[in-house]
Amino acid sequence: MKVLLTNDDGIYAPGIFAMAKEIASRDEFEAVVVAPDREQSATGHAITVHKPLRVNNVKKLGEKLEIPFYSVNGTPSDCVKLAVESVMDEKPDLVISGINRGANLGTDVLYSGTVSGAMEAAILNIKSIAVSLVDYDYEDYSTAASYTAYIANIIKDNPEEFENGTLLNVNVPAVEANQLKGVKITRQGFRQYENIFEKRFDPRGKAYYWMAGKVIEDTSDIKTDVASVKENYVSVTPIKYDLTDYNLYNSLSNWEFDD
């Protein structure tokens, strides 16, 4: 199975290296890494249209795992597009985006470069996994990498259940493997932010702002990604790029408009 790895934390981030190490250690996978040359967190599904994209072979990383590592001066979506269309000799069977430093739960998926890298694969009709470790400071990515490889094998062995374009958003609690309760299939929960903009002034007296605030989560529904990771379950949420509100669509379809 040909696997393309990308992320939004940048090619030198420990999460993507741990993921690449896990995939490279398994005979059933053939991996290529194409990732941003710097951090691209919270870039959403942005693509680069006002400057050329450049690809560099990062040999010092590739030699460690004996797989190709390429950096791109663009976003995660750029990386996937460019890898599929120009860098790789063949279209990948699976794209894995991550392992992200920090959760991608609830509405995070709308801002996340990690999820957008996987979503770009879905748009290109490729199966994909977005994987995140639910802590910014936890340094052990090995458990998240192992669970992701396990899920990748399920996708590989059950092609009839996973159509091209399937996207699984995986969030792994930041605990030791023996503390995890298992894997739970979930839906997107409620997680957003209380936005606070801290106003400051530069030496010339001009105002500027830092965005701060805190996370607001609803953990009352145990079937959601937000609640499941709190209970130390690995959350797997199938998502797609079709944002149509079908209930409202059916209602509006009965409207009559004047010509």
UniProtKB/Swiss-Prot annotation:
Its EC number is 3.1.3.5. GO terms for molecular function: 3'-nucleotidase activity; 5'-nucleotidase activity; exopolyphosphatase activity; metal ion binding; nucleotide binding. Its main location: cytoplasm. GO terms for cellular component: cytoplasm. InterPro entries: SurE, SurE-like_Pase/nucleotidase, SurE-like_sf. Keywords: Cytoplasm, Hydrolase, Metal-binding, Nucleotide-binding. Belongs to the SurE nucleotidase family. Nucleotidase that shows phosphatase activity on nucleoside 5'-monophosphates. This is 5'-nucleotidase SurE. It comes from Natranaerobius thermophilus (strain ATCC BAA-1301 / DSM 18059 / JW/NM-WN-LF). The lineage of its organism: Bacteria, Bacillati, Bacillota, Clostridia, Natranaerobiales.
